[in-house]
Amino acid sequence: PLFEGLPPLSRDATPRHWRSYGSGKILLDDGRPKNGRIAARIAAESGETGLAQAPLCLRKGETYRGSLWTRGTAPGGLLLRVTAGDWVMTRALPAPAPEWREARFEFTAKADAGDAALQIAVPGQGDVCIDQVSLMPDAAAATGGFRPDLLEAIAGLRPPLIRWPGGCYAERYRWKDGIGPQAARGRFPVSIWDDIDTNSYGTDEFIAMCRKLGAEPLIVINAGRHDPGTPRADYIKEACEWIEYCNGPADSAWGKVRAANGHPEPYGVRLWEIDNETWSAGVEGYIAIVKEFAPAMRAADPSIVLLACG
């Protein structure tokens, strides 16, 4: 999903937010992507062909850990390079396999930089698909994956409650794509902002952030208004399953999934809002939505408090 873009790109194109270099070709491949619609593909005959992303911010002395998923053929393996001014770090990565396989790496920055670049390359001949590129400083890993400066800024606001998903994002959000192993999560095309969310921040991360900040979570459910081809009953079921994932015991159907994701104890989310800005439904239409969702959601957990839009 990291390489997806809207509107659809041609096959012979560089992935969004990356630039290509070298004599080979960079393509968008939809044959067998890792978990979205497309992956980046490097097709090279000689020399060095790769993808680069910049600018990245590095702090001297900070350790960074990353990973990427690859499949294909490259007898000479892959190269990973980080450049920051005069400092250059190069790592050799193993040759890809026919099936998707994760490659991990780490490095300690030897210089401060606001314009560092990350390069992923095939040295010589190869045909390699790449997806799910990730890079995170240890400082963020220590907070559970959150940017320390951003977490500190939010903490300074002392929010008693945090609402999520928020805005138009909530109206199309499918929560099941945002749980489980990061590299297995589905993509979320946010067409209104011409963007793609890789779902690295999902329900478990939201609850974790709220607990770090001492804020009460408020979850907004998707009522399916923008998906007329799907029966509303499917969205009601999805909302109830979300409640069970958050609040059900570890031996319930979705409580087992939560426990398998490392959280055996129920979250006890009390506040649930039925949809976001519902201007397209009209007053009577939204009343009908609430009348359909509310009884089912209360049946899933009678202790919850439901909120409706004004």
State where each predicted segment sits:
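Acidic, His- and aromatic-enriched active-site or binding-groove loops in soluble protein domains
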Residues: 107-109, 210, 235-255, 296
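A general structural detector for well-ordered alpha-helical segments in enzyme core domains, enriched
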Residues: 149-153, 202-209, 238, 242, ...
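Glycine-rich, acidic and aromatic/proline-enriched surface loops and short helix-turn segments
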Residues: 164-168, 203-215, 241-249
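Active-site-proximal beta-strand/loop segments in catalytic clefts of secreted hydrolases
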Residues: 164-167, 220-225, 272-277, 309-310
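Aromatic-rich carbohydrate-recognition surfaces in CAZymes
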Residues: 202-207, 211, 219, 235, ...
